[in-house]
Amino acid sequence: MNIFCSPGVFRNGQVSSILGLKPNAISNFGFLARVPLQNGRFDRTEVDLRLSDLLIEAKLTESDFQRAPKATVRVYRDFNEVFDSEYLPQTESDYLSYQLIRNVLAAYASGGEFCVLTDARRPELIEDWYAVMKRALG
């Protein structure tokens, strides 16, 4: 994440190009995304970083992507439109990788994109990401 703090990191266009962004993207750390709920309200989830329309979750030191009760996750307006929920990673009572599910829904609601940055020495987190994304519809 430190690279995004460096002044002028987007100036020459190379980093922007790798991320599919226009040059001079502005970093917005701790971005409060608005994820629509079925009742018309919003969940104000914090995403680690927003660059233009790209939301980024950096998982560098935490052990997992958290879990949440199924009832909590099912209240998101676009949940059934975005995910094949039957096959998401889950236990009897909880969906696993809740942060990923919520942030994918945040990107979907804003018409943006979402990516995960993690340490290559944490293959279990990469597997968690793939387990969620292969259940995204469309």
Feature map (PLM): residue ranges:
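Accessory terminal regions of nucleic-acid processing enzymes
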Residues: 9, 77, 81, 137-138
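Secondary-structure boundary elements
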Residues: 9-13, 50-58, 107-113
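Short acidic, gly/pro-rich beta-turn/loop elements at beta-sheet edges
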Residues: 13, 66, 126
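Active-site metal-binding core of divalent-cation-utilizing nuclease and nuclease-like domains
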Residues: 24-54, 58-64, 68, 92-93
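Non-catalytic C-terminal interaction segments of nucleic acid-processing enzymes
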Residues: 108, 115-138
